[in-house]
């Protein structure tokens, strides 16, 4: 029986709808399954304070504390991505470290980032993508080594680091000045870096104007969320405490709740960058996570 023109159009339209739905489902499925190939965790410094209450106001005044500091090298099919660059490699040449905050903090770099990249068989020029949780010097201390990489940064953070008063936010321009000429992707919120759901930048403002965290999907390890300085150690996270050195308290609390919900929905591990006890359990090069 021959279909009428209207009937044929309806059939074609229905087929198109099915095709769109199938394509959408296929894309969603690919996004759910996509993972990075591996991720290295580097020791990018440590900082010792004589008073941890600077980071947990009113709690444990006068108690000494050691903060870990990690960088993460991610291997994706499209290339290498570095998340945070830690303290400056120059500190590794200082036997007594570098003193900051009027003597309240001593920063040390046991190994250079460059030497740890080499253990993974990677040079700084091999890194195609770079992103920082924020631009305080313990996270962006080696930023100038990655001038060939595409920079992923929240627009609010970009405006702050290259604006007229970067020191107001605790930024030190000399540590990242060379990034001015990098190819840059300015973000206004969450962003799927590779378009497949394997690496997602999560906007978490508060600690700085454009602070961000990172969700990484690994085949065996599962989903990991890298905190940046959303929180500094487990007890602060559990109590939702905000350090005194912080840009916007309300934004930080809101960002904490956002990530806490994401941890639940993604069944994710939450890795707190400066939590020494947690960091001590992480594999180091040449070992990696996959």
Regions found by a protein language model. Name each.
Residues 1-13:
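Bacterial N-terminal signal peptides that target proteins for export
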Residues 18-20, 24-126, 154-203, 221-228, 251-267, ...:
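Metallo-beta-lactamase
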Residues 44-45, 85-88, 135, 156, ...:
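Active-site metal-binding loops of divalent metal-dependent hydrolases
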Residues 61-65, 202-207:
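Short Gly/Pro-enriched turn/cap motifs at secondary-structure boundaries
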Residues 89, 101-115, 213-215, 220-290:
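Cap/insert and terminal regions of metallo-dependent hydrolase folds
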Residues 93-153:
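Active-site metal-binding motif and surrounding structural segment of the metallo-beta-lactamase
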Residues 132, 137-143, 210, 280-290:
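Short, electropositive alpha-helical surface patch
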């Amino acid at each position: 029986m021959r279909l009428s023109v209207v009937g044929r159009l309806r059939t074609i339209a229905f087929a198109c709808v099915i095709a769109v739905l199938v394509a959408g489902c296929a894309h969603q499925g690919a996004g759910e399954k996509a993972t990075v190939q591996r991720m290295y965790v580097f020791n990018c410094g440590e900082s010792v304070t004589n008073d941890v209450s600077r980071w947990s106001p009113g709690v444990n005044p006068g108690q000494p504390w050691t903060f870990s500091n990690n960088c993460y090298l991610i291997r994706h099919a499209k290339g290498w991505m570095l998340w945070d660059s830690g303290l400056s490699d120059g500190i590794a040449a200082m036997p007594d470290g570098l003193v900051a905050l009027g003597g309240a903090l001593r920063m040390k770099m046991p190994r250079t980032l460059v030497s740890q990249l080499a253990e993974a068989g990677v040079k700084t020029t091999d890194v195609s993508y770079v992103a920082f949780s924020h631009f305080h010097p313990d996270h962006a201390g080696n930023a100038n080594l990655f001038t060939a990489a595409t920079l992923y940064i929240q627009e609010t953070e970009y405006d702050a680091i290259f604006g007229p008063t970067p020191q107001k936010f605790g930024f030190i321009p000399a540590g990242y000045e060379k990034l001015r000429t990098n190819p840059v992707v300015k973000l206004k919120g969450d962003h799927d870096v590779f378009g497949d759901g394997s690496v997602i930048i999560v906007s978490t403002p508060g600690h700085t104007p454009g602070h961000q965290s990172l969700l990484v999907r690994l085949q065996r390890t599962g989903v990991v969320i890298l905190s940046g300085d959303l929180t500094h150690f487990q007890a602060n996270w559990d109590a939702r405490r905000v350090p005194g050195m912080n840009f916007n308290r309300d934004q930080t609390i809101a960002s904490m709740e956002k990530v806490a919900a994401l941890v639940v929905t993604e069944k994710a591990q939450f890795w707190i960058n400066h939590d020494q006890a947690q960091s001590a359990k992480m594999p180091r090069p040449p070992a990696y996570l996959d």
